C-alpha cells in the first residue's frame, strides 16, 4: 500500500504533467509559426506576427526557445509548490524539520539556473549582434519622427523626393479598406530581397520606428542618429507604429510599408 509521501509525490507529478500537457497542447493548436496576417496584428492573436525578414526569423526562434523553457519552469515550480504544501503541512509534520541546508540541492539550484541563462544568453547575444551590425546595403532610408508623423528620405536617390506619411482618419481608412490607426496616406516602398539600411532620428519628441514583421524597433531621438537594417524576404504590405509613448497624438504615428518585387524597383 502506498505511503502518504508517495501519494503526495504522485499527485505533484500529475499536476506537473497536466500543466505541461495543457501548455504544449496549446502550442500545438495555436502554432509557434507566427500570427497569419498581412503584416498587421490579428484580432484575438496572442503570438508574434508572421516573419518577413531573416532577423525576425531569428527573433521567433529565440522566443520559442524561451517559451519552452518558461513553460517547463512553470510546470516544475507548480508541482513543487503543491508537493510542499501537502507533504510539509502542519498536520503531516507536527514537529517541524530543523534541516539547515542541503548541499546537493544548493548545487542544483545554482548550476541549473546558470545553464538555463546560458541557453538563453548565447542565441540572444548573437541576435543582438546581427541586429546592430549593418551589413552591406543597397538601399538607404532616412526616417525622421515629427509631431505626429514620419518623414522619409532616400539619400542614395536624388531623383526621389522626400515625403511625409500621414495617418488616415477613421473615414479615410474605411473608404480605403485599410486598418485604422495603422495605415497612412503614403507608403514607404523598398525592394524585396535587398539589404536596406534605416537611419532614424527625430526633430522633436522621442519616437520608436517599429515594424513587427521585420523584427525592428529602433529609437528616434532628437539630435542622435540611430541605424539598423532589414531584408524583406517576401513581397507584401507591412504595418508598423511608433512604440514610444511620445505625446498626445502618439497613437497616430503609423507606418505603412510595402515591398515590391526586384523587377519593380524602378
Residue ranges and their predicted role:
Residues 3, 27-66, 85-259, 263-265:
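Non-transmembrane, membrane-proximal soluble domains of secreted or membrane proteins
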Residues 70:
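Active-site-proximal cofactor/substrate-binding loop regions of enzyme domains
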Residues 74-87:
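Alpha-helical transmembrane segments
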